[in-house]
Curated annotation (Swiss-Prot):
The gene is Bud13. One of its GO terms (biological process) is mRNA splicing, via spliceosome. Keywords: Coiled coil, Isopeptide bond, mRNA processing, mRNA splicing, Nucleus, Phosphoprotein, Spliceosome, Ubl conjugation. Involved in pre-mRNA splicing as component of the activated spliceosome. As a component of the minor spliceosome, involved in the splicing of U12-type introns in pre-mRNAs. This is BUD13 homolog. It comes from Mus musculus (Mouse). Residues 490-538 form a coiled coil.
Length: 637
């Protein structure tokens, strides 16, 4: 086939515009084609239907994300650290903490019992007491309207929604919630019972590693249709912590479910067999997910009135008399299954059994169960009467500090300002001795801080005095100089040695300077100076009887002198006894620039390269030119 001829820009534009017009004005055919391409809106049919699941929230997202990581990194070693994989949850937690709608209207009685009757406007939370809970803690009130998302009120049936405590003596104006617990819940998966279908994605739970995914409830007495997972109920991947014999709140992530201050989370206040059975189920299985209830908050103390105090003390006493006291069987047996499974750094393991619970009576006469058989980091014990004070050495966190200690990994909360808690964010301080009472002034102010300040001032003053004494001691001492090897240097001896060395160097330089100038020349110059001085002392007119002049004329040798041989013989006889070096006595040698006489063995042959002769010729010509120029300059005078 022949290639199509190339189109010009004008033809291409014309075809483009004509095609557009045809598409626009092509009639019903073009319209039908375009309508076929449009997606049909969702109707009653099954093909075009689009299902919008409004129930999917932060819980489902948080469940799905760690599952993928678990499946991929299931066999990798686990590092004990806080992994924030749920940004939406953190956002909702922050919104919940900063919200002004979360208030506690109930109070605690004088006997130390707490009422969980504050309203809960927070999103659902779950607390697993055998695995770390990374969700923020929430408080639940069961005698006031609960505007939170729907929850199931039955505690003896599987509940796939977050459990809540329910007060059955007041109406619940919250949104309707499911009443049947044997049907699947399309809401985000929370607790999982293996006798009901599990709509959540399959996940693995390893027994030897902490579960960083959102905690699930697992019933081990029924078959599990979901993929197999492993659950550890008492593994504590946190670092070992020293035991606190007098504290029940030594870790911010520990939940004591047997302590009176924290009755079983989310358990109801109707003292019916159903509630007792629910508590027994919690104690026996050890895996039921219950949401932690905060029993006291700063808002409670700020907003409760005197009337509310009086109104709620009676229910607290009634609750203590109806079987929720320290001797209640369900609470006493619940201490067996208090397991500390947080993800805090490794701690030292206690020497005692891990499941041993310690009971102590606080200052108000309330039983506290301090199951400190965990592996949290070592803290300093506060041995004063406050057994529920904050005595940990971990970074300060905002959290309630009553008998209910947290066993989750949720973000820090505000500290409750009770009488026995330290509500500031300063580093931990040393606790006073148990038998020592803090000193007070008559005005009631403590004197410990003043004493500490005075002690600091005294220490600083002592340091300054020591420094001053040290400076005065070595003020007039000489400086010790040392060489590289560390030996002391004597500067005086070094200066003397340097002076002697300088003198030696100067003498050697003078000697080399004489040798460089020439010894014979220097002696000849010295002789000439002496002769000149001697001639200067003579009178200006010299006569014929001058002895020096007569001797000089007699010693001269002249050619053709008949008496020359006779004179030589006489000199030889005279100098015979004297040791004189032999000297050249032949024909006159050619001159040289140093005027050196040849040796007595020279045979009279000039063996030089003629440099001396050329030099003298150049000097003679230069002198001749100067004389000629001078004569030309004075010729006209």
């Amino acid at each position: 086939m022949a290639a199509a001829p190339p189109l010009t820009k004008a033809e291409y534009l014309k075809r483009y515009l004509s095609g557009t017009d045809a598409g626009l004005e092509g009639g019903p055919e073009a319209g039908r084609k375009r309508r076929k391409k449009r997606p049909k809106p969702g109707g009653a049919g099954g093909k075009g239907m689009r299902i919008v699941d409004d129930d999917v929230g932060w819980a489902a997202i948080s469940t799905a994300k760690p599952e993928k990581e678990e499946e991929e990194d299931g066999d990798l070693p686990v590092v004990a650290e806080f992994v924030d994989e749920r940004p939406e949850e953190v956002k909702q937690m922050e919104a919940f903490r900063s919200s002004a709608k979360w208030k506690l209207l109930g109070g605690h009685g004088e006997d130390g019992h707490f009422h969980h009757d504050d309203q809960d406007s927070s999103p659902p939370r779950r607390v697993r007491h055998d695995t770390p809970d990374t969700s923020p803690p929430r408080k639940a009130r069961h005698d006031t309207p609960d505007p939170s998302p729907p929850r199931k009120a039955r505690h003896d049936t599987p509940d796939t929604s977050p459990p809540r405590k329910a007060r059955h003596d007041t109406p619940d104006p919250s949104p309707p919630r499911k009443a049947r617990h044997d049907t699947p819940d399309p809401s985000p998966p929370r607790r999982v019972r293996h006798d009901t279908p599990d709509l959540s994605p399959p996940r693995r739970v390893r027994h030897d590693t902490p579960d960083l995914s959102p905690p699930r409830r697992v019933r081990h007495d029924t078959p599990d249709p979901s993929p197999p997972r492993r659950v550890r109920h008492d593994l504590d991947a946190s670092p070992p912590r020293k035991s606190h014999r007098n504290s029940s709140a030594v870790s911010p992530r520990r939940g004591h479910h047997g302590s009176l201050g924290t009755s079983s989370p989310r358990q109801t206040h109707n003292h019916s067999p159903t509630a007792a059975q629910h508590r027994r189920t919690l104690d026996s299985s050890g895996t039921q997910h219950l949401r932690r209830a905060h029993h006291e908050s700063p808002d409670l103390e700020l907003h409760k009135a005197k009337s509310s105090k009086a109104a709620e003390r009676a229910p607290s006493k009634a609750a203590s008399q109806s079987g929720l006291g320290p001797s209640h069987p369900s609470l006493s047996t619940n201490s067996k299954y208090e397991h500390d499974s947080d993800l805090s750094p490794p701690r030292k393991r206690q020497a005692k059994a891990h499941f041993e619970a310690k009971k102590q009576l606080d200052s108000k006469g309330v039983y506290q169960k301090a199951s400190d058989s965990d592996l949290s980091p070592p803290r300093k014990k506060k041995n004063s009467g406050h057994q529920d004070s904050d005595s940990d050495l971990s970074p300060p966190r905002n959290r309630p500090r009553r008998q209910s200690s947290d066993s989750d990994l949720s973000p820090p909360r505000r500290r409750q300002r009770t009488k026995s808690s330290d509500s500031d964010l300063s580093p931990p301080r040393r606790s006073p001795r148990p038998g020592k009472k803090t000193a007070h002034m008559y005005s009631g102010a403590k004197t410990g801080l003043v004493t500490d300040v005075q002690r600091e001032h005294q220490e600083l003053k002592k340091q300054d005095q020591d420094t001053t004494d040290l400076g005065a001691q070595f003020e007039f001492t000489e400086t010790v100089f040392r060489d590289k090897s560390g030996r002391k240097r004597n500067l005086k001896l070094e200066r003397l040695e340097q002076r002697r060395k300088a003198e030696k160097d100067s003498e050697r330089d003078e000697l080399y300077a004489q040798w460089g100038k020439g010894l014979a020349q220097s002696r000849q110059q010295q002789q000439n100076v002496e002769d000149a001085m001697k001639e200067m002392q003579k009178p200006l007119a010299r006569y014929i009887d001058d002895e020096d002049l007569d001797r000089m004329l007699r010693e001269q040798e002249r050619e053709g002198d008949p008496m020359a041989n006779f004179i030589k013989k006489n000199k030889a006889k005279e100098n015979k006894n004297k040791k004189v070096k032999p000297r050249y006595s032949g024909p006159a040698p050619p001159p040289n620039r140093f005027n050196i006489w040849p040796g007595y063995r020279w045979d009279g042959v000039d063996r030089s390269n003629g440099f001396e002769q050329k030099r003298f010729a150049r000097l003679a010509s230069k002198k001749a030119v100067e004389e000629l120029a001078y004569k030309w300059s004075v010729e006209d005078m």
